């Protein structure tokens, strides 16, 4: 039992770090599952459920950190500020629609055909190269949108279209949306912030559907509940730290370091499994 709890701590740690950095949480979790297995009843169904729960822990961190900014009912806000918050939420919903529609239509097909190490490794490398290219291009371009409140509905839906690419494991939801935002002239910090906000309905919706599927097909024992709670808590706490750190980092640095990391990791993964 203790060993299984330690494994869930590791899973929560990986989720909390990789969900918000543009390096693909799904890709890292798929790789982790190849090396570390949880000893539970019906492991396949449980791992799907477990991944959902640790994602919800990560999402809760965004809600806590940005609660005032996201809360249109905050009594300390003026009428204009409340209107701005509602406007932000409408833009988030517009941005979520493309991936929600495509994800709903293709989710089962992608689970069956794309969730493997080859796809993960290739997408890690391709998006690593894309980040280096975009950051190089960005040096010669002026930032048009410096704050998340300046993002228009048109820009929101284009960022949402980029989020559709993240349906391929190894791409990174935050990586796809941040990359799209930068290409559209959004500052790194505003792009990262809007990416965090897009994650709330995107991940809650996807996680909610998988949660219901699991409950209709399986039951949870005491051990499973402890493992789920541990993973969720660790993911939440680590996400708090990572989100704060990333927002500080992007104000002074580019995403090039993440591009190099993706290329190196993707290459190592591809070589490892090809030589296995």
Could you tell me what each predicted segment is?
Residues 1-276:
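Multi-pass membrane proteins that catalyze or facilitate reactions on polyprenyl-/lipid-phosphate substrates
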């Amino acid at each position: 039992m203790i060993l299984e709890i330690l494994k869930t701590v590791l899973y929560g740690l990986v989720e909390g770090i990789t969900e918000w950095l543009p390096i693909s949480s799904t890709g890292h979790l798929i790789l982790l599952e190849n090396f570390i297995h949880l000893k539970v009843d019906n492991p396949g169904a449980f791992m799907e459920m477990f991944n959902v729960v640790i994602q919800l822990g990560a999402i809760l961190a965004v809600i806590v950190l940005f609660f005032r900014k996201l809360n249109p009912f905050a009594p300390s806000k003026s009428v204009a500020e409340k209107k701005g918050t509602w406007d932000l939420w409408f833009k988030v919903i517009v941005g979520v629609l493309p991936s929600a529609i495509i994800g709903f239509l293709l989710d089962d097909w992608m689970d069956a055909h794309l969730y493997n190490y080859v796809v993960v490794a290739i997408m890690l490398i391709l998006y690593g190269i894309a980040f280096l290219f975009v950051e190089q291009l960005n040096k010669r371009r002026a930032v048009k949108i410096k704050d998340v409140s300046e993002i228009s509905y048109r820009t929101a839906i284009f960022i949402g279209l980029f989020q559709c690419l993240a349906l391929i494991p190894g791409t990174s939801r935050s990586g796809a949306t941040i990359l799209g935002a930068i290409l559209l002239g959004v500052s790194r910090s505003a792009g990262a912030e809007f990416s965090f906000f897009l994650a709330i309905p995107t991940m809650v919706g996807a996680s909610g559907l998988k949660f219901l599927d699991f409950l209709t097909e399986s039951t949870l024992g005491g051990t499973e509940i402890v493992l789920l709670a541990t993973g969720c808590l660790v993911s939440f706490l680590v996400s708090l730290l990572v989100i704060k750190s990333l927002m500080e980092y992007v104000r002074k640095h580019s995403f090039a370091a993440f591009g190099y990391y993706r290329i190196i990791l993707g290459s190592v993964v591809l070589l490892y499994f090809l030589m296995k």
